[in-house]
Amino acid sequence: MIPQVSQEIIDLGDGRSISIETGKLAKQADGSVVVRLGNCMLLATAVSARTSNPGVDFLPLTVDYREKFAAAGRFPGGFFKREARPSDSEVLTMRLVDRVLRPLFPDDYHAETQVMIQLMSHDDNVMPDALAGLAASAALAVSDIPFYNLISEVRVARIDGKLVINPSRTELEKSDIDMMIGASLDSVAMVEGEMKEISEAEMIEAIKFAHEAIKVQIHAQQKLRAKLSSQEYRTYEGEVEDEAVYAKVKAAAYDKCYAIAQEASGKAERGEKFATVKEEAKALFTEEEYAENADLAGLVGKYFYKTNKEAVRNVILEKGIRLDGRKTTEIRPIWCETDYLPSVHGSSLFTRGETQALATVTLGTSREANQIDSPSEQGEEKFYLHYNFPPFSTGEAKPLRGTSRREVGHGNLAQRALKNMIPADCPYTIRVVSEVLESNGSSSMATVCAGTMALMDAGVQMVKPVSGIAMGLITDGEKFAVLSDILGDEDHLGDMDFKVTGTADGITACQMDIKIDGLRYDIMEQALAQARDGRLHILGKLTETIAAPRADVKAHAPKIITRTIPGNFIGALIGPGGKVIQELQKATGTTIVINEVDEQGVVEILGTDPEGIKTVLAKIDALTFKPQVGEAYEVKVIKMLDFGAVVEYTAAPGNEVLLHVSELAWERTENVADVVKMGDVFEVKYLGVDPKTKKEKVSKKALVPRPPREDKKE
């Protein structure tokens, strides 16, 4: 059977085009497409259950993105030679797509839904993560799954002042903006990226530019759907509703929730008070009513949440009072401390309200760099950040199941916020670890602040300190309130989570998630302006604690010295089977790493003992010392022989040469000891390699004038 293939082409306007094709692959999925740009091909599939599982009151959506090694003509690493758990880059792409899709499904759609995106063919000039959102939305578009508000995602960069959509990796290296934008036709839903200290106006310009490109891609999806014979969305059983129950719960709970929202209480106290009101709402109904109506308990819980959310939002909109009593632009109290942990290379504590992060910095050689090996990217990171969010940080006891997607995403955001402030000539590999010890909103921004101070405490010469803030939004369509430094509850009950990091001079990273349709750009501009004021306030608190990086690393932290040697000396420094370098490391207590770069050997010496480092440098100097013919060098006698003296260059201890008896003096020398003695230091002239003996020659007499010859007596 010949497949019925439908296709749409998207012209990118720069000689490139994206094709979206359906009808050839994975036809048993509810929807499947192949998206292609150059030789990069992504297969995206969408499948959703026909019914919801009982008791499920949320959308169980799974977005999975994988890059197949075969796509790049490579074998997977490891013993089993098979793709295993997703890499961090794959997890980050999953999150980018999920965050745009999830809020645009119908609120009452609770069927198990799975969107899978696979890189099937790789192109070195195409970054596949920028096509994943388009592929996912297109797979939903050609299905009967009720996803009415199509989306797409693009990467926007600015290269030499010009904005570019979906640049290549090579082009991106020259860019000062790297942002992923996800949007529907009407509004931007997601922003994430890093920048090199750009202004708020420049960021808005880039978002608008990307949104126009996204609209073109959404129109292409609509055209593709229109070509299909079946364009009907499936019917589904939505949530059970009962207006009478809602009215009863709201009448009993709204005023109480409204009052609690104005009391400026702490997280735990406020939670207990809301829980009491919820129990009172449950008690409005008898045991017989619960027994007769299996849905009643779930309805009461749902309607209480709805009532509570409405009350809290209205207090903010009507009175400008937040749950903890702050004004909309007010930042929570901040206290900071550096050098908290005595044995680590750098540490800091950052506490803002009920959110606390403890950051540590570890310094190492290039051997400790984070290796990246995926079908679409190979390389290493010399600066990386890990974010840990244990359950006790929110007062909970939960199973520990390894690093979560959320931890990967938050760590990546904080890493991108700081990375461009690490000097390009920093010789260290740097690992920052953030332990979130308390959390009540914007722990990732606390990580940025703690990370900045820990880096400065470690003696890393940051270009500029970085701070971060999370902004929120409450709107009813007419009135709106932009909230600075949001609480966890304000994140859950609000319409936006907008994290912004930067220096005093510009934005370094951002992450925005919009939960409503049609966010106006003027609101976004106000949020960015308000975020800047908040960032600068927080930055002032950081610099009050530590005004500048330490002049040097701490005494117990390793110091690193880098020395470049000719490539042909690498083998001599390593020695047979690594003997020379291993003995040198053991004797000096150092770590020595050698990398070959452009036919040169880049030697990194890491150690806590300055004398040990000096010994290694002296050994390198000795091994690589190469005297020039005709030049004079200072030497020291280390051995006396009948036919001369063995001397070593004082500039390269261990580098020895024979000073032959015939080169000691112009006069005939019967006894070497008559001219030089053990330990004598003097200069010799380097004569080069003797063509007969193939050994190096030096001369002491060549540096003194030759005495005139005496005429023979007749």
Swiss-Prot record:
Q: Which residues form the S1 motif domain?
A: 630-701
Localization (cell)? Cytoplasm
For region Disordered, the annotated ranges are: 694-714
Q: Which InterPro entries match?
A: ExoRNase_PH_dom1, ExoRNase_PH_dom2, ExoRNase_PH_dom2_sf, KH_dom, KH_dom_type_1, KH_dom_type_1_sf, NA-bd_OB-fold, PNPase
Q: Which GO terms describe its biological process?
A: mRNA catabolic process; RNA processing
**UniProt binding sites for Mg(2+):** D491, D497
Alphabetized GO MF terms:
3'-5'-RNA exonuclease activity; magnesium ion binding; polyribonucleotide nucleotidyltransferase activity; RNA binding
> Which cofactors go with this protein?
Mg(2+)
Stated EC number for the protein is: 2.7.7.8
Q: Which Gene3D superfamilies match?
A: GHMP Kinase, N-terminal domain (3.30.230.70), K Homology domain, type 1 (3.30.1370.10), Nucleic acid-binding proteins (2.40.50.140)
Give the record's keywords alphabetically. Cytoplasm, Magnesium, Metal-binding, Nucleotidyltransferase, RNA-binding, Transferase
SUPFAM superfamilies given for it? Eukaryotic type KH-domain (KH-domain type I), Nucleic acid-binding proteins, Ribonuclease PH domain 2-like, Ribosomal protein S5 domain 2-like
Q: Which Pfam families match?
A: KH_1, PNPase, RNase_PH, RNase_PH_C, S1
Please give the catalytic activity noted in the UniProt record.
RNA(n+1) + phosphate = RNA(n) + a ribonucleoside 5'-diphosphate
Q: Which PROSITE patterns does its entry note?
A: KH_TYPE_1, S1
Instruction: Report the residue ranges that make up the KH domain in this protein.
Output: 558-620
A GO cellular component term found in this entry reads: cytosol
Task: Write down the PANTHER family for this protein, in alphabetical order.
Answer: POLYRIBONUCLEOTIDE NUCLEOTIDYLTRANSFERASE, POLYRIBONUCLEOTIDE NUCLEOTIDYLTRANSFERASE 1, MITOCHONDRIAL
Q: What does the function comment of this entry state?
A: Involved in mRNA degradation. Catalyzes the phosphorolysis of single-stranded polyribonucleotides processively in the 3'- to 5'-direction.
Q: Which family does it belong to?
A: Belongs to the polyribonucleotide nucleotidyltransferase family.
HAMAP family (UniProt xref): PNPase (MF_01595)
Q: What protein name is recorded for this chain?
A: Polyribonucleotide nucleotidyltransferase
Q: From which organism does this entry originate?
A: Flavobacterium johnsoniae (strain ATCC 17061 / DSM 2064 / JCM 8514 / BCRC 14874 / CCUG 350202 / NBRC 14942 / NCIMB 11054 / UW101) (Cytophaga johnsonae)
